[in-house]
């Protein structure tokens, strides 16, 4: 017996299946930095939709599989590494002019100290769309700490999207990290 016969609401037309690009991933990353920075007041943040409907995970309507949208990764990393005490970094950065907000710093960042794991995670976004920006961090309060991993989410094309079988935007580990004592 067909399950839709008794429960026709289980089959619904595709609605609000927005496809997100790299630009959206940057915005989500910036939003999460703000939420973490204000975690003394914001106690819970969640996604209302997880699959297909304005969501970070999409499925093939023919049952062919699923894929992660560009916005999946900032949420994943914030969930995995954003546990602990939010640290308010002092940001000294180059700046650039915007049409609506005047001059803003190129770097937006927050750090999280996980005492249990003895880890500090720095979340940072380069807001300068024209130039690469070097991020220097001073971790003198965490003597003996070393870089365990440097993960980046990057693309030269702000409008690039992911699709089934085409993961154009995904995090990668980079070796472009140096540490001075």
Task: List the model feature ranges, each with a label.
Residues 93-94, 99-106, 125-181:
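C-terminal beta-sandwich/jelly-roll accessory domains of carbohydrate-active enzymes
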Residues 44-46, 123, 151:
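Conserved active-site loop/cleft motifs that coordinate metal ions or position small ligands
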Residues 2-109, 115-118:
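Aromatic/acidic polysaccharide-binding cleft in carbohydrate-active enzymes
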Residues 119-125:
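Short beta-strand elements of extracellular/lumenal beta-sandwich folds
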């Amino acid at each position: 017996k067909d399950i839709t016969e008794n429960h026709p609401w289980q089959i619904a037309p595709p609605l609000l299946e927005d496809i997100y690009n790299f630009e959206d991933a940057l915005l989500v990353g910036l939003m999460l930095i703000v939420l973490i920075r204000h975690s003394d007041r914001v106690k819970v943040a969640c996604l209302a939709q997880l699959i297909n409907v304005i969501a970070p995970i999409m499925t093939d309507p023919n049952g062919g599989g699923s894929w992660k949208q560009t916005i999946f990764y900032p949420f994943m990393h914030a969930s995995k590494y954003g546990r602990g005490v939010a640290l308010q970094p002092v940001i000294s950065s180059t700046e650039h002019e915007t049409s609506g907000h005047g001059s803003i710093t190129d770097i937006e960042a927050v750090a999280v100290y996980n005492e249990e794991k003895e880890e500090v995670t720095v979340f940072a976004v380069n807001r300068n769309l024209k130039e690469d920006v070097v991020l220097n961090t001073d971790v003198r309060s965490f003597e003996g700490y070393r870089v365990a991993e440097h993960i980046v989410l990057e693309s030269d094309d702000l409008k690039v999207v992911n699709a089934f079988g085409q993961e154009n935007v995904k995090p990668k580990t980079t070796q472009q990290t140096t540490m001075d004592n």
